[in-house]
Amino acid sequence: MKYLAVLYFFVFFITPISLRAQNLLGLPLVNNYNKTVYGGGSRTWDIKQDSRGILYFGNSEGLITFDGRYWKSYALPNHTIIRSLWIDQHDRIYVGGQGDFGYFEPAEQGGLRYTSLKALIPEEYRNFADIWNTLSFGQSVFFRATNVIFELKGQKIAVHPAAAEWYFMGKVGESLFAQDKKNGLLVYRNNHWSPVLATLPYREMKIASMLPLGKERIVVSTLNNQNYLLKDRVLLQLNKEHWDDSYTPSAARIDDSTFVVGNAKEGCHIRDRDGKTIQRIGIREGLVNKNISAVFVDQQKNIWVASDNGISVISYGSAVRYLRPNLENEVTGLSSLIFDHKLYLSSSNGVYVAPISKGLKDQSRSLSSFSLFPKSDGGEAWLLEELNGRLLLGHNKGLFQIQDQALLPLSNRTGTWNVLPLNSVYPVNQALVGTYQGLELLNYQNGIFQSGGQLRGFVDSYRFLELDEKKTIWASHPYRGIYRIRLAADRHAYDAVLLTKKNGLPSDYQNFVFKIKDQIVFATEKGLYTYDYTKNAFVKSADYKEFDGLTIRYLKEDKEGNIWYCTDKYVGVAQFDTKNKSYQLIKFPEIEGMNTSGFDHINTYDKNNIYIGAEKGIIHINYEKYIQEARKPLVLLSQVTAKSAQDSILFAGYFTKNATGTYEQLRADQLELASKFNSFQFAFSSPSFGIHEHMEFSYQLVGYDENWSTWENIAEKSYTNLPSGKYRFQVRVRNNLNQISETVSYDFTILPPWYLSIWAKLVYILLGALSIYLFFKVQKQVWKKQQLQYEKKMAQLRYIHQLEIEKSEKEIVKLNNEKLEQEVLVKTKELASASMQLLENSGTLVKVRDELAKIEGSEEEASELKRINNLLKDVEKNSANWDQFALHFDELNDGFLNKLKSNHEGLSRNDLKVCAYLKLNFTTKQIAQLQNITVRGVEIHRYRLRKKLPVGKDQSLSDFLNEI
């Protein structure tokens, strides 16, 4: 035991103080979040992380979660402080509050639901204050209050009362320790507490944390600012030079060789396995407060720090580090160089130098510190260049050689930008120096550099110079173009031509010249160009198409053939793929906006040490580690919100863990939403802390979007006025190395409006069928009614038509009658005329006959008169006039004469004439004239007719004839 004590004394007391005071050369990036950002109280007491990468903070206002983009808070039912946290293998979140403890787990709609365990505590132990420690051990979860430790196993809680007062509880490896005021340090074994150290160094000693330090060695820190080493049940106080006498409430292991402790005086200390502080991170290094209440190391080796004024994250595990030579007065890093096992850094105010550890792959992990090189301040130090085994410094004051601790002036010309060797043979005997006001020669002879004088005619500022295989010097000017310079053998005479846009450059502005793969390359606003001597013009390079469209300001090739570059916005590397003979462009989002825009610098020392000029010092990238430790990113669906007059959270970020341990949406959780919920906002994230704000997302709403969206750094998507149907929102994330995550999906259904639902459609079908039935029924009735109306109408029409016909017929009859009447009238007139003609002729003939009878003469004359008289009688008896008369008479009297002849065949021609005359109401006298008989003869003839015709005694002959 004495031997061990001596050994520990030697280790912790004899170690050189200067070494202990040094830090790792490279600082990790520190980001801070105040309570306005995370939406909680100013004090955080504990930090944990689940299997998906989501962080949990026990805060003075409850439980706070952070998924890389979004902060959320959950209060306890009694709205008290959460002092302690623990997350088990099933991602159940156990919390210890004030007067209560329990757990959070996913509930409906993806939110966290709190379940109190207080009801399981025996009644007599339910009165307790704060739960200061919560952790799992074996199959149990332990909760430490001041007076009692509760052990949850299954659905039962066992009680471990304090003998006096429980000061501490913590797990170290496979052991659970607790400190009791009376019984000292105890270990939990076989369901009871066994003593480890019954007697502590002093009575009021209170343990704050216990950390494993190598095999079977535990560092014990107390609230009384004391630090001890526990080994083999022996507690030894550590040297104050190793451990600060400060309040150390929290500690966490980083890896097998380092751990972090939270310190009340200086913030965080990173310590190695021997207990030595290798890095201090306090307010100067970026923390907002040095009073640390909790520290936690996440899955990516980031250190999360809870302090009085907020939450900080230290990107300790990152391959990117920051070399800041002067934390009190920040300087811009302009150039860097490794020379003689020292890192030289030229800045906006002099040169800083730091020793680096030999044999250490990652030089930023050297235990060292920067110091200002003597007399190098007072202006910008633009250039560090090794030439012929000498270290040259291009300074605002001129060109110098750094030798030992002195600056040897080589040129007093103001402002040296660069030094270009004019041959590749070692040692270089001559170089060209670009200055603020032209070009100058630098000669090397007998191990000494001397100025060769200025080249006359060059008065411009030349920051970039390169030499090609034809010994042509190319110099770029920021706003004029590119100079092509050929020196004569004496190096003083030269031929210089200014080449501009007219010679193929995309612009006269922002052109820079570099040498890549032994070829002169011109970086422009539109990509990379080369010079074609056959065309005497600049042409876009076919070898570097990946750079097309980029505004390149700086290029540097590394030993692996990768091309590091700076644009006007970021720094990246074109990683060469030897298999495909192509480049993959990789950006570094961690340092976006930090490089020295306009005065860029990249030093590709090797794959473990890439130095980049920054606004604050130099950025160091261990590129090999950066690539090797890159992990496939994880995407999280943080929230789904239905947008309406009052937004509704449909999903709050937590899927259910299935049997395979994968988080996914269960079928029972797939919502069917009313049609009014047709506008949504999806929020997503990735817990890739350090670059989480630069991750790119792609999404698709299956059922609406035809394709995946383009990659962009936007962590939310909204949809409005979606139609009813089934949808699946899916999202994935891509990091800067083009690694793509698995897809996370969320299924939901928008139901049709009630008037388009299945039941509504069934009702519509029934109503439609009923409507059709009623329609046809009504139509049938209407048709019948219309048919009746039609028939009635048709009857009316037929009646009207009949009337029309009858009317027409009557009209026709009338017209015919009128026509007949006209014809009768005409014929009557003709008949009357004929009758009058007959009467007149008859009378005339009678007069002629009478006159002839009066004539007396000779016998011969008497014979002639007799003959004439006979002729007259023949005329009177001529039937020609009668035939015409009979024809007209029958037409006017409906065939009167024909009827008489047919009905009374015994009637003679004269009988018919007499009947016709009687029908015409001729008088007896008129008839006698027409018949050329006497009146008496007419009367006799009438008498005979009465006999021939069956005329009654009481009926006149005229009436009888009129009835025929």
Ranges and model annotations:
Residues 54-57, 92-94, 140-143, 175-178, ...:
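Conserved beta-propeller blade signature
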Residues 21-49, 76-81, 103-132, 164, ...:
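Residue-level "micro-hotspots" composed of small/polar
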Residues 943, 947-964:
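Basic, Lys/Arg-enriched C-terminal extension of HTH/homeodomain DNA-binding domains
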Residues 321-325, 760, 773-846:
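Cytosolic signal-transmission helices at domain junctions
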Residues 876-877, 883-940, 959-963:
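Helix-turn-helix DNA-binding segment
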Residues 49-52, 87-90, 136-138, 171-173, ...:
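Residue-level detector of Asp-centered blade-edge/turn motifs that repeat once per structural unit
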Residues 67-70, 106-109, 152-156, 188-192, ...:
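Short loop/turn segments that connect beta-strands within beta-propeller blades
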Residues 60-64, 99-102, 146-150, 181-185, ...:
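Loop/turn residues immediately N-terminal
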